[in-house]
């Protein structure tokens, strides 16, 4: 009898190597992401002590400007170099113009540059270089003094610079998203404030209205004369009284004739002329107000 062993599935070497490669790639990607996050969290470096000790390197062009005719080295001048130097300056000016316009559009301020400028000015003051520069200034002519403005007329630009600095500092601060909950709370608070204002305005209107002062003065007080005058061309209407019939008696053969009022009849006390009636009506209308 031949004993057969059980067959088990075995992983191939290729599949194991592929899995190892995938795991290594995942680990590498995670490490790169963490490095990028760390680089973003890094604070920018300020002014280093080594840069302050070494100082700025003076370029050759600045030395040429200080001694353009090379009097210290014998007075030999190379005209080709002078022409090339002028061409380079034009290109540098264009580049500088583009850079300044871009920095003005971003509205951000380089704090390190301001710090370096402040340190340089303070060092010059301590060394006494500023006093020498002030002495180098040319004396002004009498005509130049005429164009100068007195101090009381000069407009101080300190306020403008302070406003510019504050705007630049605020533009550099990144905005933080507070979330949806904060926005919803702000909306609810604004709606409540609107409702309060509307309620206050309505209450003020109700308090201002009183029975003594009418709301519409024109309706209550304007009385036009056309309501008091009678129509001129209107036909005159008179109430004609029908004649009263005489009572019949026994033995009367003729028809009873209507009674005629005597010519000089006295009027009762209730009867008045139309002028008196309108006059009394006018007086009553004015008494109401």
UniProtKB/Swiss-Prot annotation:
Residue list for modification Phosphotyrosine: 147
PTM-bearing positions, type Phosphothreonine: 253
Keyword field contains Phosphoprotein: yes
Classification lineage: Eukaryota, Metazoa, Chordata, Craniata, Vertebrata
UniProt similarity note: Belongs to the TLS1 family.
Modified positions (Phosphoserine) in chain numbering: 15, 17, 261
BP GO annotations: chromosome segregation; mRNA cis splicing, via spliceosome; regulation of homologous chromosome segregation
Keyword Transcription regulation appears in the UniProt entry: no
Region of interest called Interaction with SNRNP200, as start-end residue ranges on this chain: 5-58
Subcellular location(s) of the protein: Nucleus; Chromosome, Centromere
Sorted UniProt keywords: Centromere, Chromosome, Chromosome partition, mRNA processing, mRNA splicing, Nucleus, Phosphoprotein, RNA-binding, Spliceosome
Organism of provenance: Mus musculus (Mouse)
Region ranges (Disordered): 1-30, 85-111, 232-289
Predominant location: nucleus
Residues spanning the membrane: none
This protein's name: Splicing factor C9orf78 homolog
Listed GO CC annotations: chromosome, centromeric region; cytosol; nucleoplasm; spliceosomal complex
Subunit structure: Component of the spliceosome. Interacts with SNRNP200; the interaction is direct. Interacts with PRPF8.
């Amino acid at each position: 009898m031949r004993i057969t062993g059980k067959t088990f599935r075995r992983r191939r070497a290729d599949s194991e190597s592929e899995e190892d490669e995938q795991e290594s790639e995942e680990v590498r990607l995670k490490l790169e992401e963490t490095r990028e996050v760390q680089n973003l969290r890094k604070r920018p470096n300020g002014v280093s002590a080594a840069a302050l000790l070494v100082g700025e390197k003076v370029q050759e062009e600045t030395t040429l400007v200080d001694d353009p005719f090379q009097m210290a080295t014998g007075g030999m001048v190379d005209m080709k170099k002078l022409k090339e130097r002028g061409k380079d300056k034009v290109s540098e000016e264009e580049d500088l113009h583009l850079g300044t316009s871009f920095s003005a559009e971003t509205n951000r301020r380089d704090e390190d540059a301001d710090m370096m400028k402040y340190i340089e000015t303070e060092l010059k003051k301590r060394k006494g270089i500023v006093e020498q520069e002030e002495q180098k200034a040319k004396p002004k002519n009498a005509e130049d003094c005429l164009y100068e403005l007195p101090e009381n007329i000069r407009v101080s630009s300190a306020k403008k610079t302070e406003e510019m600095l504050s705007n630049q500092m605020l533009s550099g601060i990144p905005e933080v998203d507070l979330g949806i909950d904060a926005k919803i709370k702000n909306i609810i608070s604004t709606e409540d404030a609107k409702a309060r204002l509307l309620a206050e305005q309505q209450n003020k209107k109700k308090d201002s209205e009183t029975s003594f002062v009418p709301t519409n003065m024109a309706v209550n007080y304007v009385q036009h004369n056309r309501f008091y005058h009678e129509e001129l061309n209107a036909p005159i209407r008179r109430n004609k009284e029908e004649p009263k019939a005489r009572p019949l008696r026994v033995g009367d053969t003729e028809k009873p004739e209507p009674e005629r009022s005597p010519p000089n009849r006295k009027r009762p006390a209730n009867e008045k002329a139309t002028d008196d009636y309108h006059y009394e009506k006018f007086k009553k209308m004015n008494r109401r107000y």
